[in-house]
């Protein structure tokens, strides 16, 4: 489950029109949501408040296995409607499998003029969190320099680092660091430059999207919501997001990228490359409200399935470490998504196969019913298509993963009344002495106004 600060940051990106998904670092986000989800450890509480649309506060406490906590503050230049934990869209609070819409060039902020002078300022976000009792301080500053350029500064200050530095044993110490990041997104290309002060590391990441780039329009949430309004009906005419038909196979787009980093201080370097294929977001009901007179609407609703299964296929390769990874993820039904990944090292011949799934639970089951029969008329009219009842609200998600080398993990995330709950367990089925390695419960509540 996303911490409140992460949820606010994502809301800030969405509110300012920045596409955080068009980054090389997020190339495998869809499969990671199923195969690399984080299970809570111990007992964790979190309470947050938004007294106004610009300022937020958050408090958290870990009761087990040790007692500690933190206090955080967030300020944004633009108003954000973050709602409350009781009415926020649940899928916005968890990492999940998604098929993202085609990338678009970010749009700039509308200009504001007063007495012949431009008075609008660039958007920014300020975040700070202090941990108790360690005194560690985390800070983040993000600002939009231009419609396609964003800068970020992240810093960590830990007073314990100076104490460990004086230790004669040279024990590994929590370090303080500051990192600068500059992101340039044009839709088709996205480049990120980073520099870390602690180890003097320079890095560059680049992602290229092949095919068409979406025009300026409203940002898209995911494939379950509409991606672009259809310009024509289903009677054999293409939608906006459709491309030329292909014989068989999946229809989608390809993205490829790479990263390179170098540290003169540590005398080390690294490089990796990756490629991703993702299907086009489907625009069938209930995402789009097709005309009721469409002759194909009844058959589409009766099946209730997209024209092609939402699918994401990724491959990564690190030549210096010899690591190769391939993942396949797909939504096999409305509420069930599955993923599989195979990792292999060409130097050590070590391999790992991981599988996982996420299943969404709902309050009620949506079903298709016909309209009530109308009174007899002298003139025959075509029968009305079946009506789609509202699909039940999402109440939670169950995630499970297993692999050939790691433990089996199971987690449930949901909403109880006005509180978000996350309950998970990690077990080692091969160990008779300690089959359960960890169990955790996380409770989160936040409100606005």
UniProtKB/Swiss-Prot annotation:
InterPro entries: Mdm10. Keywords: Membrane, Mitochondrion, Mitochondrion outer membrane, Transmembrane, Transmembrane beta strand. Residues 285-301 have a biased composition (Low complexity). Pfam families: MDM10 (PF12519). It is found in: Mitochondrion outer membrane. Transmembrane segments: none annotated. GO terms for biological process: establishment of mitochondrion localization; mitochondrial genome maintenance; mitochondrial outer membrane translocase complex assembly; mitochondrion-endoplasmic reticulum membrane tethering; phospholipid transport; protein insertion into mitochondrial outer membrane. One of its GO terms (cellular component) is ERMES complex. It is a multi-pass membrane protein. Its main location: mitochondrion. Residues 215-244, 282-307 are annotated as: Disordered. Component of the ER-mitochondria encounter structure (ERMES) or MDM complex, composed of MMM1, MDM10, MDM12 and MDM34. Associates with the mitochondrial outer membrane sorting assembly machinery SAM(core) complex. HAMAP family: Mdm10 (MF_03102). Belongs to the MDM10 family. Lacks alpha-helical transmembrane segments, suggesting that it resides in the membrane via beta-sheet conformations similar to those predicted for other outer membrane proteins and porin. PANTHER family: MITOCHONDRIAL DISTRIBUTION AND MORPHOLOGY PROTEIN 10. Component of the ERMES/MDM complex, which serves as a molecular tether to connect the endoplasmic reticulum and mitochondria. Components of this complex are involved in the control of mitochondrial shape and protein biogenesis and may function in phospholipid exchange. MDM10 is involved in the late assembly steps of the general translocase of the mitochondrial outer membrane (TOM complex). Functions in the TOM40-specific route of the assembly of outer membrane beta-barrel proteins, including the association of TOM40 with the receptor TOM22 and small TOM proteins. This is Mitochondrial distribution and morphology protein 10.
């Amino acid at each position: 489950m996303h911490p409140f600060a992460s949820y606010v940051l994502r809301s800030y990106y969405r509110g300012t029109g920045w596409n955080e998904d068009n980054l090389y670092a997020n190339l495998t986000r869809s499969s990671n949501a199923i195969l690399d989800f984080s299970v809570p450890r111990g007992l964790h509480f979190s309470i947050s408040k938004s007294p106004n649309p610009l300022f937020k506060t958050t408090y958290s406490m870990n009761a087990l296995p040790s007692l500690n906590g933190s206090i955080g503050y967030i300020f944004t230049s633009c108003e954000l409607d973050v709602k409350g934990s009781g009415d926020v869209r649940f899928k916005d609070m968890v990492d999940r499998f998604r098929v993202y819409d085609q990338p678009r060039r970010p749009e700039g902020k509308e200009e504001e003029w007063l007495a012949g002078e431009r008075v609008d300022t660039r958007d920014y976000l300020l975040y700070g969190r202090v941990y108790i009792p360690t005194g560690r301080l985390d800070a983040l500053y993000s600002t939009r320099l231009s419609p396609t350029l964003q800068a970020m500064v992240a810093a960590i200050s830990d007073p314990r680092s100076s104490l460990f530095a004086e230790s004669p044993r040279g024990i590994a110490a929590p370090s303080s660091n500051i990192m600068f990041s500059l992101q340039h997104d044009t839709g088709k290309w996205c480049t990120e430059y980073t520099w870390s002060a602690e180890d003097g590391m320079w890095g560059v990441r680049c992602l290229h999207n092949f095919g068409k780039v979406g025009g300026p329009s409203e940002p898209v949430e995911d494939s379950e919501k509409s991606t672009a309004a259809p310009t024509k009906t289903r009677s054999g005419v293409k939608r906006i997001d459709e491309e030329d038909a292909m014989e068989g196979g999946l229809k989608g787009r390809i993205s490829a990228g790479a990263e390179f980093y170098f540290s003169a201080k540590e005398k080390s370097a690294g490089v990796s490359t990756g490629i991703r294929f993702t299907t086009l977001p489907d625009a069938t009901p209930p995402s789009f409200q097709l005309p009721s007179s469409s002759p194909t609407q009844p058959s589409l609703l009766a099946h209730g399935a997209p024209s092609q299964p939402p699918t994401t296929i990724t491959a990564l390769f690190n030549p210096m470490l010899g690591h190769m990874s391939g993942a396949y993820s797909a939504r096999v039904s409305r509420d069930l998504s599955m993923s599989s990944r195979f990792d292999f090292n060409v130097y050590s011949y070590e391999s790992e196969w991981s599988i996982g799934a996420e299943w969404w639970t709902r309050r009620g089951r949506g079903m298709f019913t016909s309209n009530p029969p109308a009174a007899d008329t002298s003139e025959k009219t075509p029968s009305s298509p079946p009506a789609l009842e509202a699909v039940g609200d999402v109440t939670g998600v169950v995630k499970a993963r297993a692999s050939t080398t790691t433990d089996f993990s199971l987690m449930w995330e949901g909403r109880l009344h006005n509180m978000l709950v996350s309950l998970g367990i990690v077990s080692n089925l091969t160990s008779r002495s300690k089959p359960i390695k960890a169990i955790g419960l996380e409770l989160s509540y936040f409100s606005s106004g």
